[in-house]
């Protein structure tokens, strides 16, 4: 379960601030969920909940049939699924830590023990890149507080800061049951309910900071025929002033990724850096409307009093849930060293 010679894991202690080092970013991850709310969802509910670990094991069988994943060693409820997300970011944390010389610190809005941590100076003081991972289900009502918005706004006045917002998918946002079923048959993930809506907190940040984006759908990315390899991204490298796409051709596979729909034509306000081709094998309202790729990476340069950058990328790009290719690792390194 743990890698040999890995540092001892610590739990249930206060964060020790990292010292500023010129040219080396201090990266923080902020999971927007209430861990208890998500884990206490009724497992008989059809929509807007995570799978239990038992459900994951059944669907993915026999991938998780080793000793590491049994009842004696791993949580079998929804909590096990959330812990898999935590574990899946460790490769990114390791790579970014090596690249920057600073450990990547992970925070949760409400953690396993019920401690609530809104975004404030305790998080922001020693953070240069804040990665907001929007994996809160909408019914959990994790809205950003006015004082959080004010704290982030003040932080973004600091030179060299970057707010990375990662809203996840919005599947089945209609009352039309036939459309929900069409979406399901498109992404083909039996662990995703017919309605699964995420990222109220991230949406609140996007509204507060005038980010002209809406996270929509859960789209299956296209692969190269006869392989499991993703089709290359469509990139706009002339707009990539931060070098985020240097040596990057693909991100990673995830069966239901959000489309970051733009609500403005102002190219000076926000730049679309990369699009991902969509799997066209099964119909979807998005492709039926004439679209064959979705927006995957966007950037807002500093503007007015905001000295920091804003980047939008799905949170699952920073996990190894479906593997971590050489191209993806290069993207992680670019994010760490931007």
Model feature map: region roles:
Residues 2-338:
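Short, surface-exposed patches at the edges or C-terminal ends of soluble domains, predominantly
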